[in-house]
UniProtKB/Swiss-Prot annotation:
Chain positions recorded as Zn(2+) 4 binding sites: 325, 343, 346, 369, 372
UniProt: Zn(2+) 2 binding residues: 293, 296, 322
Protein's name in the database: Zinc finger protein neuro-d4
Tissues and organs where the protein is expressed, per its UniProt entry: At embryonic stages, predominant expression in the nervous system. Expressed specifically in postmitotic neurons (at protein level).
One Pfam family cited in the UniProt record for this chain: DPF1-3_N
Residues engaged in binding Zn(2+) 1: 274, 277, 301, 304
Name of the gene encoding the protein in the UniProt record: Dpf1
Location of this chain's protein in the cell: Cytoplasm; Nucleus
A GO cellular-component term linked to this record: nucleoplasm
Placement of covalent cross-link Glycyl lysine isopeptide (Lys-Gly) (interchain with G-Cter in SUMO2): 106, 129, 133
Gene source species: Mus musculus
Length: 387
């Protein structure tokens, strides 16, 4: 069934006029908004749409100028671009003469006299002051942005030339983003690795890592240089190491054999606690006999050292050495520790090139030395692995 639309006249004349007024004001606001809009890119046609100025009002109509033309509308208002102010005084023109500073100014020269000359000089000094102020404000803004500006720019903007005075050298400014990123990475590295080597500047996450770095890098270099080139080693460098060790209250591994507590008969006094669990025996929870190093005196539980039953019984039959004091049982040296091969039954160390026949690569699985093979025979770890 069709809907019956009531006539506007039946609603009243006041209501009709109010509706027309609302419609007119809405159209006026819409047209004003469209005229003030910036051009936008149409995604379908790729054209930058802008106000077309084709909508005119009755007040814009004019009489026709050509035959058969009823109305004419005014063209779009042309706006002149702003340009530099042209000097009105014809005498205020650029100077075309070379000025000799030593010679006195001639009245017949190209420079004008009186108030015009004063105006030229004042304008020239004023322009220089304005340029200097602009340069100072630019530099201040750039410094402030480098310190406080929050957002990051591309890394490609790291180096940009800054305009300076004509007689000064050109400098380079660092982009805000690159400097900020480098500061962030540096602060993150400082936070993650707070322990710094005072000689080479290398960073570590914990103090044991820094101590290991000192011992195996700088201390070894110093000991080698003391024997070969004693005069080439700076004195303050050795003092830095000694001061660091005193503050740390830590003895390097290379000096532990000399500073270990010794009995009157010359034997090393072992520690009375486990260096791994500090006496708690966390792995088994039961009391265990400590195994002590014959060189440095450090001790450990067999369970903390991950020793097998055969290994625990074998280490008590000879002068056992911890992993840091370990040396080759054949040649007696601790050099080339990367070539040391450890027995899985007695924990003795052997250089692979000291064995007979020598080995080029470590064997796969368990390995037993010739002493354990002779003593344990079929109970050796090497036989168990093969079977």
């Amino acid at each position: 069934m069709a809907t019956v639309i009531p006539s506007p006249l039946s609603l009243g004349e006041d209501f009709y006029r109010e509706a027309i007024e609302h419609c007119r004001s809405y159209n006026a606001r819409l047209c004003a908004e469209r005229s003030l809009r910036l051009p936008f890119l149409d995604s379908q046609t790729g054209v930058a749409q802008n106000n077309c100025y084709i909508w005119m009002e009755k007040t814009h109509r004019g009489p026709g100028l050509a035959p058969g033309q009823i109305y004419t509308y005014p063209a779009r208002c042309w706006r002149k671009k702003r340009r530099l102010n042209i000097l009105e005084d014809p005498r205020l023109r650029p100077c075309e003469y070379k000025i000799d500073c030593e010679a006195p100014l001639k009245k017949e020269g190209g420079l004008p006299e009186g108030p015009v000359l004063e105006a030229l000089l004042c304008a020239e000094t004023g322009e220089k002051k304005v340029e200097l102020k602009e340069e100072e404000t630019i530099m201040d803004c750039q410094k402030q942005q480098l310190l406080e500006f929050p957002h990051d720019l591309e890394v490609e903007d790291l180096e940009e030339d800054i305009p300076r005075r004509k007689n000064r050298a050109r400098g380079k400014a660092y982009g805000i983003g690159g400097l900020r990123k480098r500061q962030d990475t540096a602060s993150l590295e400082d936070r993650d690795k707070p322990y710094v080597c005072d000689i080479c500047g290398k960073r570590y996450k914990n103090r044991p890592g820094l101590s290991y770095h000192y011992t195996h890098t700088h201390l070894a270099e110093e000991e080698g240089e003391e024997h070969t080139e004693r005069h080439a080693l700076p004195f303050h460098r050795k003092n830095n190491h000694k001061q660091f060790y005193k503050e740390l209250a830590w003895v390097p591994e290379a000096q532990r054999k000399h500073t270990a507590k010794k009995a009157p008969d010359g034997t090393v006094i072992p520690n009375g606690y486990c260096d791994f669990c500090l006496g708690g025996s966390k792995k088994t929870g039961c009391p265990e006999d400590l195994i002590s190093c014959a060189d440095c005196g450090r001790s450990g539980h067999p369970s903390c050292l991950q020793f097998t039953v055969n290994m625990t019984a074998a280490v008590r039959t000879y002068r056992w050495q911890c992993i840091e004091c370990k040396s080759c049982s054949l040649c007696g040296t601790s050099e080339n520790d990367d070539q040391l091969l450890f027995c899985d039954d007695c924990d003795r160390g052997y250089h692979m090139y000291c064995l007979s026949p020598p080995m080029a690569e470590p064997p796969e699985g368990s390995w037993s030395c010739h002493l354990c093979l002779r003593h344990l025979k079929e109970k050796a770890s090497a036989y168990i692995t093969l079977t």
